[in-house]
From Swiss-Prot:
<keyword id="KW-0017">Alkaloid metabolism</keyword>
<feature type="binding site">
    <location>
        <position position="349"/>
    </location>
    <ligand>
        <name>NADP(+)</name>
    </ligand>
</feature>
<feature type="binding site">
    <location>
        <position position="107"/>
    </location>
    <ligand>
        <name>Zn(2+) 2</name>
    </ligand>
</feature>
<dbReference type="InterPro" id="IPR047109">
    <property type="entry name" value="CAD-like"/>
</dbReference>
<comment type="pathway">
    <text>Alkaloid biosynthesis; ajmaline biosynthesis.</text>
</comment>
<dbReference type="Pfam" id="PF08240">
    <property type="entry name" value="ADH_N"/>
</dbReference>
<dbReference type="InterPro" id="IPR011032">
    <property type="entry name" value="GroES-like_sf"/>
</dbReference>
<feature type="binding site">
    <location>
        <position position="110"/>
    </location>
    <ligand>
        <name>Zn(2+) 2</name>
    </ligand>
</feature>
<comment type="similarity">
    <text>Belongs to the zinc-containing alcohol dehydrogenase family. Class-P subfamily.</text>
</comment>
<feature type="binding site">
    <location>
        <position position="193"/>
    </location>
    <ligand>
        <name>NADP(+)</name>
    </ligand>
</feature>
<protein>
    <recommendedName>
        <fullName>1,2-Dihydrovomilenine reductase</fullName>
        <ecNumber>1.3.1.73</ecNumber>
        <ecNumber>1.5.1.-</ecNumber>
    </recommendedName>
</protein>
<keyword id="KW-0560">Oxidoreductase</keyword>
<keyword id="KW-0862">Zinc</keyword>
<dbReference type="InterPro" id="IPR020843">
    <property type="entry name" value="PKS_ER"/>
</dbReference>
<feature type="binding site">
    <location>
        <position position="104"/>
    </location>
    <ligand>
        <name>Zn(2+) 2</name>
    </ligand>
</feature>
<feature type="binding site">
    <location>
        <position position="220"/>
    </location>
    <ligand>
        <name>NADP(+)</name>
    </ligand>
</feature>
<dbReference type="GO" id="GO:0009820">
    <property type="term" value="P:alkaloid metabolic process"/>
</dbReference>
Length: 363
């Protein structure tokens, strides 16, 4: 008799919402999770952030996912079971799971605390885990992960407003830290005022950095300055404003998740500085070489953050009262939320109330 598949051997029944084809429409879905291993933490999911990457992944815009796919990179809940060798978490603790649940643990990236760049990184959904089964994300009743990829969620942080820190938060935090854009007194430009952009402003201000928000939308000026504490605002389609800002920035974080012109942005940079593209932008940018060369400017990119950076970011956020500005939604609103994300109709992040609104499928 043929042996059971690894997935059939999973004893823990779970449920969530999954995309089953490239329409990206999510619907109720039953599946199973593995038993809690010696180094694992089982998490009852209470809140899950919804990000632009979830929309792209559900539709398989990147061409690298299979179905069914349960999204969710920003997961917060409580530990319900811990393995015998787990040391940093106990049952009942507030915990979080971000964009990764595994890596090889042996390569140069892993041994230097850069697991998100491991060639064998296992993301929280849409990948194959070490046991040969697909990973399913946070739009679900529970999850289980190796304790290395489970984070202690500070008591001071509210769960719902803190959930987006697990992807959006660490993405901008890691970019600022790694590229040295976190020094007090620096002048940083933040392009885009969405999920990543609004958190970039909050972290930058906590670092003591002067912030200019750059947007195509004049209506966001009040939000940027009055609500988020930015120091200045530039309309990127206003040639006079952009000229006035020429050569004033020590760096730029570009958080816009779609391809857009960047030549005018390069003009805002001082010489010998960089524009950092943050996040999983699809497509290719047109890169003007001469404006880069004459000022020795750089265009670089980053995505996500390591486990070490993620825990540091959560602790820093708790210390400085940094949370996302969120709209809390029920599970069955998720498809409408995805549509609104594509239209830019959210201030600034959707978070699903998993604990109170996710119910088991009827059949």
């Amino acid at each position: 008799m043929a042996g059971k598949s690894p997935e059939e051997q999973h004893p823990v029944k779970a449920y969530g919402w999954a995309a089953t084809d490239s329409s990206g429409i999510l619907s109720p879905f039953k599946f199973s999770r593995r038993a809690t291993g010696d180094h694992d933490v089982r998490v009852k999911i209470l809140y899950a952030g919804v990000c632009h990457s979830d929309l792209q992944s559900a539709r398989n815009d990147m061409g690298c996912f299979t179905y069914p796919l349960v999204p969710g990179f920003e997961t917060v809940g409580t530990a319900t079971e811990v393995g015998s060798k787990v040391t940093k978490v106990k049952v009942g603790d507030k915990v979080a799971v971000g964009i990764m649940v595994g890596s090889c643990g042996k390569c140069d990236e892993c041994v230097n605390d850069r697991e998100c760049y491991c060639p064998e990184v296992i993301t929280s959904y849409g990948r194959i885990d070490h046991d040969g089964t697909p990973t399913y994300g946070g739009f679900s009743s529970e999850t289980v992960a190796n304790e290395k990829f489970v984070f202690c969620f500070p008591e001071k942080l509210p769960m719902a407003a803190g959930a987006p820190l697990l992807n959006a938060g660490v993405s901008v935090y890691s970019a600022m830290r790694f590229y040295g854009l976190d020094k007090p007194g620096m002048h940083l430009g933040v392009v885009g005022l969405g999920g990543l952009g609004h958190l970039a402003v909050k972290f930058a201000k906590a670092f003591g950095v002067k912030v200019t928000v750059i947007s195509t939308s004049t209506s966001k000026k009040g939000e940027a300055i009055n609500d988020l504490g930015a120091d200045a605002f530039l309309v990127s389609t206003d040639a006079e404003q952009m000229q006035a800002g020429s050569g004033t920035l020590d760096g730029i974080l570009d958080t816009v998740p779609v391809v857009h012109p960047i030549e005018a942005l390069l003009g805002l940079l001082k010489n010998h500085t960089k524009l950092v593209l943050v996040g999983a932008t699809m497509g290719s940018f047109e890169l003007p070489i001469l404006p880069l060369g004459v000022g020795r400017k750089s265009v670089v990119s980053t995505i996500g953050g390591s486990t070490k950076e993620t825990q540091e970011m959560l602790d820093f956020a708790a210390e400085h009262d940094i949370t996302a500005s969120v709209e809390i939604i029920p599970m069955d609103y998720v498809n409408t939320a995805m549509e609104r994300i594509e239209k830019g109709d959210v201030r600034y992040r959707f978070v699903i109330d998993i604990g109170n609104t996710l119910t088991p499928p009827e059949s």
